[in-house]
Amino acid sequence: MTDHNLLPEPKKILWRVSELNRNARVILEQTFPLLWVSGEISNLKRYPSGHWYFSLKDDSAQVRCVMFRHKNLYLDWIPQEGMQVEAQALVTLYEARGEFQLTVEQLRRAGLGALFEAFERLKARLQQEGLFSPEYKQPLPRFPRQIGIITSPNTAALRDVLTTLQLRLPSIPVVIYPAPVQGEGSAAAITTALHTAAVRGECDVLILCRGGGSIEDLWAFNEEIVARAIAACPIPIVTGIGHETDFTIADFVADARAPTPTGAAQLASPDRQAILHRLQYWLHRLQQTMERHIERRMQATDLLAHRLIHPGERIRHQQMHLLQLRGRLQNAWNRQVEIRTWRIEETGRRIHSAKPDIQAGIRHQQELAARLQRAMAHRLENLQFKLRQQQQHLIHLDPKAVLARGYSIAYTARGDILHDSRQTRAGDNVRLVFASGWAKADITETGE
């Protein structure tokens, strides 16, 4: 018979409370995935920190829950005591007290799960059909001639859109296609408004918008008939539905999506200030480009003018300059005539008011006209005289005039002009050009 008191006892593991709670928390979090739990809210407390503490219960049990501020901020509704909800949560243990609890990630009213499932099914089907594909998206016009708005009248969303359009570019006309955006029949009304806008074809872009709300409030924009009406519309559509965190089927099908109605108005309309700044920028660039182009042309013209040595070209330039001077002279003449005419009329008025000798005034007028005629004729004669001098000077510079005085030009066999006796040697052939005709010669001797 064995004496159990003599057997060695197994080694005992002694856990500290904190170690036990920590290991239990790890086991819970690793064992249970992120899951959905339904129940009734009770003992709801909202702390100044923004965190929410409550219990979820059913007929036979309850569990403690916490939803931290950075999670509950995204809710567009406020939970109330006794409300039936569905919570997506992580199963865990509050180590400090050893309390089993749920850390809630998302919270929705009971029954919305079916809506989310319907949303995901329709989204997947339309995506498979290609309604969300980028190649089907129409580009938004940069400068729309008219903008259409599809929303419910007398709403904050409509006021926000109209205010934004007025601030950005008040000259753009706006057409409102009224349609209820919430409740029974709203999806059909939105579809009708889209069809009306497409048939009338009076707008270059459409804004489909409404303010924030729950998933039920926004459900009209998740209906298939609305999605297909958007896809079939030949006019580009910008959606601005709810808040930044709200996404609807209409947002995925539309040509562009904005987080709010105000953002949709900004996407659909050009900014007047941005246009003005852009125009000023391009005007400045154009001015700089033109100035540089003119400067380059002026430099090229100066270079070409410097290289031109033919007297005929210089004569033509002088003739063009003379024509310019004639034009300026004619303009000056016209201005002087206008000035003299005004002075004569003014003198006539003075004569009429002072009752002087009319004949003396007429003689003064005739004298002024004669003096002006003589001055202009003298000026024109001087300009013509200078032109003749320039022409005569250029004629004297013509190489042919030098040849006419008995000189000749000698060319080598390659056609180069001979400037120096060292360019040739005895036995070379040269060509002599005279004022009239030419002759060949043989070099018999060279010297310096």
Swiss-Prot record:
The lineage of its organism: Bacteria, Pseudomonadati, Pseudomonadota, Betaproteobacteria, Nitrosomonadales. Its EC number is 3.1.11.6. It is found in: Cytoplasm. NCBIfam families: xseA. This is Exodeoxyribonuclease 7 large subunit. GO terms for biological process: DNA catabolic process. It catalyses: Exonucleolytic cleavage in either 5'- to 3'- or 3'- to 5'-direction to yield nucleoside 5'-phosphates. GO terms for molecular function: exodeoxyribonuclease VII activity; nucleic acid binding. The gene is xseA. One of its GO terms (cellular component) is cytoplasm. The keyword Nuclease applies. Heterooligomer composed of large and small subunits. Keywords: Cytoplasm, Exonuclease, Hydrolase, Nuclease. It comes from Nitrosomonas europaea (strain ATCC 19718 / CIP 103999 / KCTC 2705 / NBRC 14298).
